[in-house]
A protein has these predicted regions:
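Single conserved hydrophobic/aromatic residue that forms the stacking wall/gate
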Residues: 1-6, 11, 245-254
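A residue-level structural signature of the nucleotidyltransferase/glycosyltransferase Rossmann-like core
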Residues: 2, 93, 187-188
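Acidic, low-complexity central loop/insert segments
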Residues: 138-242, 246, 251
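Short capping/connector residues at structural and topological boundaries
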Residues: 60, 66, 84, 91, ...
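Acidic, proline/glycine-enriched N-terminal capping motif
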Residues: 8, 12-127, 132-134
Length: 254
């Protein structure tokens, strides 16, 4: 009987709203945003932002009455004809250390990592057990037992977990440590025929000449008196275009 199992006092006239369950986890509070180290500078430049995973990243910078298409066309032409700068800080950066680091990476990447020399870079494809591509990016050999992996911007955490699963559950005999340094380094990509010229105008103790710093090579040094990592890589394959990744400690970059 109803009187034995409950009370009509508990029956509401209307159902509970979904908002009551969600509480403050809605709108801007639903998911915390990650902002770039140079976020205030992008705002000052009039950037229109887009959601890229958890990151707020500039999509384009309109001038005057430009719409999105016009702004993107102007920016693309500037990179083709001269130079452009992209804040690429969300790019995933995982560091792999240990005496078995090279063997470990050779197992998880489709590419041959055994032949990658110190100071060299190589584009890599990461596959799952079914042979399906789950991520890609440039692999840098910092030392014989130290590698820097670049993942897709939204995949750093997922790939980090993927690597840890293999190390902790399958290949427990390998001596390898994986750390996520994505938010520790601000990354800028300088692109276009004048990229090298612009970079050479800044105080830098790295030889940036074409002969000393070739395609798919990596260097460490100081830029504007700050430690930096510089990588030469091309995303188009055009010889006339030089792509340079400038990576600096986040706090110093700000």
């Amino acid at each position: 009987e109803l009187g034995l199992v409950g009370s009509e006092m508990c029956i509401r006239d209307s159902p509970t709203t979904i908002g009551a369950f969600a509480g403050i986890e809605q709108g801007d509070l639903y998911q915390p945003y990650q902002r770039l180290p140079a976020h205030p500078a992008h705002v000052a430049a009039g950037a229109v932002f887009e959601d890229f995973g958890a990151w707020k990243r500039p999509a384009y910078y309109p001038q005057g009455s430009e719409d999105e298409e016009a702004a993107l066309a102007r920016e693309a032409k500037a990179v083709r004809d001269s130079v452009g700068l992209l804040d690429y800080s969300p790019l995933g950066k995982l560091e792999v250390h240990g005496p078995d680091a090279r063997e470990f990476l050779n197992r998880v990447y489709l590419n041959n990592i055994q032949t990658l020399k110190v100071g060299g870079c190589r584009y890599g494809l990461m596959l799952n057990e079914a042979g399906i591509v789950i991520d890609d990016g440039v692999i840098v050999c910092l030392a014989e037992d130290h590698f820097l992996l670049h993942t897709t911007s939204g995949g750093a955490t997922t790939i980090h977990q993927h690597l840890e699963e293999w190390l902790q559950c399958e290949w427990v005999d390998l001596e390898v440590i994986v750390s996520n340094s994505t938010t520790q380094w601000a990354t800028m990509m300088l692109s276009g025929p004048q990229a090298r010229t612009v970079l050479q105008k800044l105080p830098c103790d790295i030889d940036l000449s074409r002969e000393a710093f070739r395609h798919m090579q990596y260097r460490e040094g100081n830029l504007c008196s700050q430690p930096c990592r510089i990588l030469r890589a091309s995303f188009t394959g055009e010889v006339s275009v030089s792509y340079t990744h400038l990576t600096l400690p986040t706090r110093r970059f700000v």
